[in-house]
Amino acid sequence: MAYGWWRRRRRRWRRWRRRPWRRRWRTRRRRPARRRGRRRNVRRRRRGGRWRRRYRRWKRKGRRRKKAKIIIRQWQPNYRRRCNIVGYIPVLICGENTVSRNYATHSDDTNYPGPLGGGMTTDKFTLRILYDEYKRFMNYWTASNEDLDLCRYLGVNMYFFRHPDVDFIIKINTMPPFLDTELTAPSIHPGMLALDKRARWIPSLKSRPGKKHYIKIRVGAPKMFTDKWYPQTDLCDMVLLTVYATAADMQYPFGSPLTDSVVVNFQVLQSMYDQNISILPDQKSEREKLLTQITDYIPFYNTTQTIAQLKPFIDAGNITPNTPATTWGSYINTTKFTTAATTTYTYPGTTTTTVTMLTCNDSWYRGTVYNDKIKNLPKQAATLYSKATKTLLGNTFTTDDHTLEYHGGLYSSIWLSPGRSYFETTGAYTDIKYNPFTDRGEGNMLWIDWLSKKNMNYDKVQSKCLISDLPLWAAAYGYVEFCAKSTGDQNIHMNARLLIRSPFTDPQLLVHTDPTKGFVPYSLNFGNGKMPGGSSNVPIRMRAKWYPTLFHQQEVLEALAQSGPFAYHSDIKKVSLGMKYRFKWIWGGNPVRQQVVRNPCKETHSSGNRVPRSLQIVDPKYNSPELTFHTWDFRRGLFGPKAIQRMQQQPTTTDIFSAGHKRPRRDTEVYHSSQEGEQKESLLFPPVKLLRRVPPWEDSQQEESGSQSSEEETQTVSQQLKQQLQQQRILGVKLRLLFNQVQKIQQNQDINPTLLPRGGDLASLFQIAP
């Protein structure tokens, strides 16, 4: 019998280390020597080993000092209840070719068909948002907050679930202020976030197999937050934390394997559009002059888009029979290549630049495919289609401008399509090539202009949302959503255009004699007369207003964003990052005990109902101490008159169902300077501007007596009274808010102003500069 085999089995090799309880020798007991000074010997004995002598320093006896700090204690409410808010949400959902968008802004969109979401997100969490998720059946509360008007916040545990194929990078911020700036979205780009030491990688199961399928992160309370009891109404809108997340590609960080180059190509408008870019009606005459110059330049017609836009107009019989050219064949150049004659054309937008072309119809040797009769077709087609659009739409459509029409206007695909019969004979555009790994960011500028602006130069007042000195691949990340939040225009993708200035492109998007000059890029689909995504179904209203906007420039930003390092290349139709959260709260208060009396004669069953017991959750916005009964309100079996009067002021709930919030609540707010806020509010409330500029302790009549006297003469007495009434009402609202804040400070219920939402602190209330 091989019983000894078990003893002979080789043990697993381990690194040798000394056990803490074993010593090579032990301290030896010896006679204590006389010492002078402030040290004395200490004799200790250990088990086993040799003896060894040990010493310790003599502790100097000093005078007793007072305590540097004291502990301030707060009385807790009589009733306390722990509550965990547990739920599941998608941190981000990224559809195909939506990498550069912000999912937090598009989370509540209902567009279909088409991709949804974005490749990055800036989510915030508040108690109101958690209650809103509860109303959407996205989380559950382990305890009810009914009649408990106080609360404490203890932190949150987050669990991020790894995707099978796509990697993610997240960053959790608990440092106020929780506001977006022009640098927030570029810093969330995977190429930038990969360099952040506080970022956490969420690798896919494919990139890092064999590990847990989730990553747990423990997050405490926000910085500068004092842990004490607060009314739920005060913590309702306080931002607890923000989550920045983005999709990334760890397997192919420097370009997709489905492409043969990392260079990005797009087109920009030529300089002929510089002074004719506005869409205002008073600039129509200038646009007509430019359109005439473009239509007279016959080499621009050397493209297949000429057939797509103008041939249906001829085939439909829109040309009068008396004209000699009634068929499409009459507009084609029939001159053979053997002819050595040439024709000189003046390039549009200039008076001195000329281009010499052969008269033959061979476009590969700089010939023209069409003859001079085609010059009038674009204007005739644009005029007819523009009038037809106005007739169909009726009073809802007031624009009748053939220069902006889809088929033959200034931005028709005949002039802007990159597909030419010969690649060296371009249209009214310039091909731009961009290598993301040569971009240092120095001198780059990215901004938007309203469609009414009359030039392409950057202006500090008219231009908005400037991002400078950053690589284009980072500046393009989440840019459109930042512009929408910064300007407050949710339809900005149809009301503004994008301009770029960069010395790191080929050719350079830079004019050395005019440093503020920008260039208008557009996507390949817009140049071909298609919608974003490649659809040929252009709406009839958009065909009458066909010009480059952010809606048609989004694909350029998408290509720039995907060219950066570690960027997700949108290889899957839809990806999502799931998260589970567990927010820890404590509800407290002094509620009136509610005694439930049941019918003793009714038959009851020992077993409970099959339906899970539901909790009564109250909106934290209305769960305030003023609207809650407390134990001190109940005297001798009755409620006091003050308590009844206070409860009668509670607002009643209505059954009107709204269409939803204009912007998702989880989306973070944007930072506005005090100067921008004053400019916006001065447009909405002109009388309030006088209240903020002139302090109440100064005499404004002496300083502005001359300017105000002329205004008072023109205004009637009723108008002056209305303005004064409006000023008094606004001032009254601010004073009431001021007294409310002072009362909270006296009650030790104040919150750090940096944690409050925008407009909730005294500095923003009275425009005090930080």
From Swiss-Prot:
UniProt GO BP: DNA replication
Q: What is its main location?
A: virion
Q: Which residues cross the membrane?
A: none
Could you confirm whether the keyword Zinc appears in this record?
no
Stored InterPro entries: TTvirus_Unk
Can you say where in the cell this protein is located?
Virion
Q: Which GO terms describe its cellular component?
A: T=1 icosahedral viral capsid
Q: Which family does it belong to?
A: Belongs to the anelloviridae capsid protein family.
The name this protein carries in UniProt is Probable capsid and replication-associated protein
Q: Identify the species of origin.
A: Torque teno virus (strain VT416)
